Amino acid sequence: MSIKAEEISALIKQQIQNYQSEIEVKDVGTVIQVGDGIARVHGLDNIMAGELVEFSNGVMGMAQNLEESNVGIVILGPYKDIREGDDVKRTGRIMEVPVGEELIGRIVNPLGQPVDGLGPILTSKTRPIESEAPGVMDRKSVHEPLQTGIKAIDALIPIGRGQRELIIGDRQTGKTSVAIDTILNQKDQDMICIYVAIGQKESTVRGVVETLRKHGALDYTIVVTASASQPAPLLYLAPYAGVTMGEEFMYNGKHVLVVYDDLSKQAAAYRELSLLLRRPPGREAFPGDVFYLHSRLLERAAKLSDAKGGGSITALPFVETQAGDISAYIPTNVISITDGQIFLQSDLFFSGVRPAVNAGLSVSRVGGSAQIKAMKKVAGTLRLDLASYRELEAFAQFGSDLDQATQAKLNRGARTVEVLKQDLNKPLKVEKQVAILYALTRGYLDDVAVADVKRFEAELFMYIEENHKGLFDTISQTGNMPADEEWNTAIEGFKRTFAPSN
């Protein structure tokens, strides 16, 4: 068998023509130092700020410090298996999370991965977690109410859709309870709720999820959790992941409520990262950009203009104070960013006033324009009445000889405080709130014993439901106040049937 040189050269030429190069150019760096969730990497000269990188063991990281000779990378996962000398690959992607309807009812971590054991989340849509807030011309002023179902808030510190309302108070003053009740009250309100738990105990998050499930609220809620046992970068990223999931709905014309529980822990996680990255510390050892950390997050809550679809994100950030000190660094920062604050006081909480809202220090800067007409009418003087009662109460402790007007004010104040108390996980529809506040402000409760106020309220609602349902329907459908005569007839009719306890 003879081998022909022409055939061989033809074969070689054919092979050369069919050859496809599979050379892939990758930007690879080398770990020069690792520890405490931070890796220093040499060789990634073209990396972008905030870009995702992949370590040789599959763990992801995020580029934070771009220095002359190395890159400071925060590791988004376990870092114990990463060694000096390991390769680090660029991905060319900025941090993204999955978004869309498929997330509703699920519990995810800040990377958008499910942690509820219910299988993968079947969505291919993602959004970058850092995005620009809507501009001035893309916004509209807040004008629709967001009913929390809590009398003290809806009457005194009303919240509108698209507002940022800070909830501030010491630990164990019922901050989370206020948020949970607000989420429960959004049932049938066409709202999507996102609860972001930052640095909470896993048992606490489990309790919140069970409460939401029991009341059917998981049908419209996404839970994003970065528990206390997780690395600091995940605690820092959690709020951004939550608001990004909300933005997908907002830009599609829907209304979203995002609860950040709580931003003090996010600030502490960011401080930890910044100090490990050797950034210069400032006041209370926080880095210089801790204000920007929160402002760029909360500015993404907005009420969009009609041209942009009219969707909204309402933000309820929490900040924990130490011994009621609202003049500390993080509290003052977040107060200045938000459109008002609800201050929960431990003294009130322990004296049995729950929710423990301090009406004097709490304020809503834009919510008043979103309040429905009926509520505006009955709650107009409530804040002043409550403030003057608190003042008189302190004064009345010293003397027993009080004139009739002062005594009447004290009596009315005691009943006001009693009416504004509310049980846990029992949000109240706005029409019922208006009914009891009308009875209070028009003096119908003045001759009812303080101990009977709770029962009076419950029985009044039942009586109106059965005999004067039109009153409730008018408020729920139009937001307007029915005529005073109708109210007076209903409440006087009820009072004739109400039996005071002995």
From Swiss-Prot:
Site feature Required for activity, where: S362
One protein family per Pfam: ATP-synt_ab_N
Keyword Zinc-finger: no
Keyword field contains Kinase: no
Location(s) in or outside the cell: Cell membrane
Primary subcellular site in the record, as a coarse category: membrane
Catalytic activity: ATP + H2O + 4 H(+)(in) = ADP + phosphate + 5 H(+)(out)
Alphabetically ordered keywords of this record: ATP synthesis, ATP-binding, Cell membrane, CF(1), Hydrogen ion transport, Ion transport, Membrane, Nucleotide-binding, Translocase, Transport
EC number(s) given by UniProt: 7.1.2.2
Classification via PROSITE patterns: ATPASE_ALPHA_BETA
Function text: Produces ATP from ADP in the presence of a proton gradient across the membrane. The alpha chain is a regulatory subunit.
Self-association and partners: F-type ATPases have 2 components, CF(1) - the catalytic core - and CF(0) - the membrane proton channel. CF(1) has five subunits: alpha(3), beta(3), gamma(1), delta(1), epsilon(1). CF(0) has three main subunits: a(1), b(2) and c(9-12). The alpha and beta chains form an alternating ring which encloses part of the gamma chain. CF(1) is attached to CF(0) by a central stalk formed by the gamma and epsilon chains, while a peripheral stalk is formed by the delta and b chains.
Similarity-based family: Belongs to the ATPase alpha/beta chains family.
PANTHER family hit by this protein: ATP SYNTHASE SUBUNIT ALPHA, MITOCHONDRIAL (PTHR48082:SF2)
Protein name: ATP synthase subunit alpha
